């Protein structure tokens, strides 16, 4: 017995082979018992090594049916014509106990094609096109369908335009992206850029974004709302003056003056607010910090 795994193209496992052998042994044991009972009690003339077909033939002969060598089965005295003997029944047999009807679709020729109609250039017309449509159609409006022009459907349409096409010799020009005109026009670039205190001013050519911004996240976010008065060359990172004391000191003086007025308050949207702990990063002077690069303090 061939299992589904072997039919799929893969080798069955040892467990599947054992199950197949077990089922085959069980089937043969049951068939042997049936054959033994038919020979002993039913007076059936069955050969020693027979299969299920021999049993079916014997049962049909006992019921009054005739089974020929090629498998054609019919009642005695009601032999079918030779044309339909090997195929399916096309009508009702007056001698059969069960009336076998043909398919309903075979009684009326269908005027509607079940596939695309043949093109006009084809040498074999579509078999579903009827010259004289029958008046016994199920639906009246289907009578005019055979008179419709054939469908011109092609599944091999060219992907590229032909040489005669006006666009074949002149391919469309690809527009060059204007990355250098206004980088903040593109939303994905603006999202990826870090926030800076000078972001509120829309310049024609904005400052270059530093590659490594080591500022704190809260400081960067708070810089969006604080109104800093800085020069056009102000650095974008709040910690820039800590590593470069020689930079412009105008922005540090502005921030220190703002922090000096009113203690720990700063301007927020034209008002005075008190910052929380973590925002006071500009109170540390540059001379109070000692930067060492891999050298321990002596």
Swiss-Prot record:
Positions of region (PEST-like): 204-224
Subcellular compartments: Nucleus; Cytoplasm
Pfam families the record matches: BES1_N (PF05687)
Impact after mutating residue 206 to L: Increases lamina joint bending
GO terms under biological process: brassinosteroid mediated signaling pathway; DNA-templated transcription; response to brassinosteroid
Superkingdom classification of source: Eukaryota
Main location: nucleus
Cellular component, GO annotation: cytoplasm; nucleus
Induction data: Down-regulated by 24-epibrassinolide.
GO MF term list: DNA binding; DNA-binding transcription factor activity
Keyword annotations from UniProtKB, A to Z: Brassinosteroid signaling pathway, Cytoplasm, DNA-binding, Growth regulation, Nucleus, Phosphoprotein, Repressor, Transcription, Transcription regulation, Ubl conjugation
Post-translational modification comment from the UniProt entry: Phosphorylated on serine and threonine residues by GSK2. Dephosphorylated during response to brassinosteroid. Ubiquitinated by PUB24. Ubiquitination leads to its subsequent degradation by the 26S proteasome, thus reducing sensitivity to brassinosteroid signaling.
Biased composition (Low complexity): 96-128
Phosphoserine modified-residue sites: 156
Remaining remarks: Plants silencing BZR1 are dwarf with erect leaves, and have reduced brassinosteroid sensitivity and altered expression of brassinosteroid-responsive genes.
Subunit structure: Interacts with GF14C. Interacts with PUB24. Interacts with SMOS1.
Known role: Positive brassinosteroid-signaling protein. Mediates downstream brassinosteroid-regulated growth response and feedback inhibition of brassinosteroid (BR) biosynthetic genes. May act as transcriptional repressor by binding the brassinosteroid-response element (BREE) (5'-CGTG(T/C)G-3') in the promoter of DLT (AC Q9LWU9), another positive regulator of BR signaling. Acts as a transcriptional repressor of LIC, a negative regulator of BR signaling, by binding to the BRRE element of its promoter. BZR1 and LIC play opposite roles in BR signaling and regulation of leaf bending.
Protein name: Protein BZR1 homolog 1
Organism of derivation: Oryza sativa subsp. japonica
Chain's gene name: BZR1
């Amino acid at each position: 017995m061939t299992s589904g795994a072997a039919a799929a193209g893969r080798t069955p496992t040892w467990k599947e082979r054992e199950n197949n052998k077990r089922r085959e042994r069980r089937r043969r044991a049951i068939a042997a018992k049936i054959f033994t009972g038919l020979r002993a009690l039913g007076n059936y003339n069955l050969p020693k090594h027979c299969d299920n077909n021999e049993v079916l033939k014997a049962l049909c002969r006992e019921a009054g049916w005739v089974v020929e060598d090629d498998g054609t089965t019919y009642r005695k005295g009601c032999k079918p014509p030779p044309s339909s003997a090997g195929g399916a029944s096309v009508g009702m047999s007056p001698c059969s106990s069960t009336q076998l009807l043909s398919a309903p679709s075979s009684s009326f020729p269908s005027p509607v094609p079940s596939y695309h109609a043949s093109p006009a250039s084809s040498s074999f017309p579509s078999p579903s096109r009827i010259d004289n449509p029958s008046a016994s159609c199920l639906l009246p409006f289907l009578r005019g369908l055979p008179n419709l022009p054939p469908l011109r459907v092609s599944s091999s349409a060219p992907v590229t335009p032909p040489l005669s096409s006006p666009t074949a010799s002149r391919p469309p020009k690809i527009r060059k992206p204007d990355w250098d005109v206004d980088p903040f026009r593109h939303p994905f670039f603006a999202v990826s850029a870090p926030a800076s205190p000078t972001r509120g001013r829309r310049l024609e050519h904005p400052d270059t974004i530093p590659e490594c911004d080591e500022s704190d996240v809260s400081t960067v976010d708070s810089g969006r709302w604080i109104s800093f008065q800085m020069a056009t060359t102000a650095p974008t990172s709040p910690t820039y003056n800590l590593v470069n004391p020689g930079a412009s000191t105008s922005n540090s003086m502005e921030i220190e003056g703002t922090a000096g007025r009113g203690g720990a308050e700063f301007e927020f949207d034209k008002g005075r607010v008190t910052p929380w702990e973590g925002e006071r990063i500009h109170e540390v002077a540059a001379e109070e910090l000692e930067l060492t690069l891999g050298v321990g303090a002596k």
